[in-house]
């Protein structure tokens, strides 16, 4: 059994500080296993990986779960820009600091970031890629629902109960927690209100149109010659069955796992099944 993670800092693009949870750092340099770098989705943070991170650490992997810029405890972008290219530059910088072979596990935004980072860093640096409920040709309706949730509450909540109600409405398939203390990892209390941990500019500032990058992201994925696995939540409205089928036709060497009880937030919705799939993939 590996001890729990410690907090670590990394340098992103432009020396921006990125904060992560890190397991098994002391044994990484002489391990034959790759480092696992876990990248969350938009509006999430490193704590979404806590269970799977611990499972991987218990199996001897050096694991890093990273807060993206403008999320969690990482610095916010001074210019308010959160394009996928900027996020990818952050990750290529982190990969250089890790300095050993890495498998990237990326959910949603983190998966798209991982595609570009893997392409830019090369197969000696990134040796595998897990895409968690994301493909370059994702569903507009599903991503619009995510954006609506994030922008609707940009001015925060009066109480934790209000935040819990908002999450329950957004994720009706999840059980509403009775103890709301865990929400404080996703919220910050200032000026008498609870605000989401992410920079409001992430959803309010002008950024790149993700649909304008479909061709680039798709071609980057096709060009990758490393092992790839797509994990889809069966209840997802972001990756449709047709979208997954199209992806697998274009990236025929990719493996595919579908989690029957999970939606877009697959890592948390069906955590045991998710962790089992990830462990099997990275252990080969």
Regions found by a protein language model. Name each.
Residues 1-36, 58-61, 99, 127, ...:
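Alpha/beta-hydrolase fold catalytic core
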Residues 26, 50-53, 58, 64, ...:
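Active-site loop/oxyanion-hole signature of alpha/beta-hydrolase fold enzymes
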Residues 158-212:
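Conserved alpha/beta-hydrolase catalytic His-Asp/Glu region
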Residues 259-275:
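Catalytic histidine-centered segment of alpha/beta-hydrolase-like enzymes
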Residues 33, 41-44:
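Active-site glycine-rich loops that stabilize anionic/oxyanionic intermediates
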């Amino acid at each position: 059994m590996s001890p729990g993670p410690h907090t670590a800092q990394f340098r992103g693009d432009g020396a921006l500080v990125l904060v992560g949870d890190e397991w098994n750092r002391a044994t990484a340099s002489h391990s034959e296993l790759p480092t696992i770098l876990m990248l969350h989705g938009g509006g999430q943070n490193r704590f979404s990986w806590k269970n799977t991170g611990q499972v991987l650490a218990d199996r001897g992997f050096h694991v890093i779960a990273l807060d993206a810029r403008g999320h969690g405890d990482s610095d916010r972008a001074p210019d308010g820009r959160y394009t996928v290219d900027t996020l990818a530059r952050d990750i290529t910088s982190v990969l250089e600091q890790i300095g050993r072979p890495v498998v990237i596990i990326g959910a949603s935004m983190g998966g798209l970031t991982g595609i570009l980072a893997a392409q830019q860093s090369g197969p000696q640096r990134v040796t595998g890629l897990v895409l968690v409920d994301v493909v370059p040709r994702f569903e507009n309706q599903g991503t619009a629902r995510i954006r609506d949730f994030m922008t609707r509450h940009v001015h925060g909540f009066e109480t934790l109960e209000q935040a819990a109600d908002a999450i329950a409405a957004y994720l009706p398939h999840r059980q509403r927690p009775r103890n709301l203390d865990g929400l404080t990892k996703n919220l910050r209390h200032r000026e008498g209100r609870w605000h989401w941990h992410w920079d409001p500019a992430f959803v309010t500032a002008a950024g790149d149109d993700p649909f304008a990058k479909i061709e680039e992201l798709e071609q980057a994925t096709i060009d990758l010659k490393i092992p790839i696995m797509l994990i889809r939540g069966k209840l997802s409205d972001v990756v449709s069955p047709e979208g997954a089928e199209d992806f697998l036709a274009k990236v025929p060497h990719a493996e595919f796992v579908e989690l029957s009880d999970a939606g877009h937030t697959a890592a948390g919705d069906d955590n045991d099944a998710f962790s089992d799939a990830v462990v099997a993939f990275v252990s080969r």
